[in-house]
Amino acid sequence: MKKGTVLNSDISSVISRLGHTDTLVVCDAGLPIPKSTTRIDMALTQGVPSFMQVLGVVTNEMQVEAAIIAEEIKQHNPQLHETLLTHLEQLQKHQGNTIEIRYTTHEQFKQQTAESQAVIRSGECSPYANIILCAGVTF
């Protein structure tokens, strides 16, 4: 049995294949996922698993250099936005690097998901609960 934090074989596999600056998306249940992009569907029912649960597991295993978030989250989901920023701050301390946070429009965000290695869909049902993680290096 794998000893690491990620037991899901699809998520573990995609993280292990990430190269520097490759991207991985963690999204809510409603984000449209391009047909050309690998979909890893974790959603069981509304809210299960939550966006933050999925993000926490992914970032325990993935070295993150930058994060892209839809600008609209600030207005339409401020509580999750604050939780997300706190998580990224803690991740910076744990990794020992600065994580650049970039904001974009939701429309541009959706277009960028097509270039990611995979999209991991959570059961989150709150607005703009999506993030694009850019892979860093551990050396």
Curated annotation (Swiss-Prot):
Q: Kindly tell me the pathway this chain contributes to.
A: Carbohydrate metabolism; D-ribose degradation; D-ribose 5-phosphate from beta-D-ribopyranose: step 1/2
Give a GO cellular-component term. cytosol
Q: Which domain of life is it from?
A: Bacteria
Q: Which GO terms describe its biological process?
A: D-ribose catabolic process
Give the active-site positions: H20
Localization = Cytoplasm
The UniProt record gives the binding positions of substrate as: D28, H106, Y128, A129, N130
Q: What is its EC number?
A: 5.4.99.62
A Pfam cross-reference name: RbsD_FucU
**Catalytic reactions on record:** beta-D-ribopyranose = beta-D-ribofuranose
- The reply on keyword Translocase is no
Q: Which GO terms describe its molecular function?
A: D-ribose pyranase activity; intramolecular lyase activity; monosaccharide binding
Keyword Isomerase assigned to the entry: answer is: yes
Key words of the record? Carbohydrate metabolism, Cytoplasm, Isomerase
Protein family membership = Belongs to the RbsD / FucU family. RbsD subfamily.
PANTHER family in the cross-refs? D-RIBOSE PYRANASE
Q: How does it assemble?
A: Homodecamer.
Q: What does this protein do?
A: Catalyzes the interconversion of beta-pyran and beta-furan forms of D-ribose.
Official protein name in the record: D-ribose pyranase
To which species is this protein native?
Answer: Shigella boydii serotype 18 (strain CDC 3083-94 / BS512)
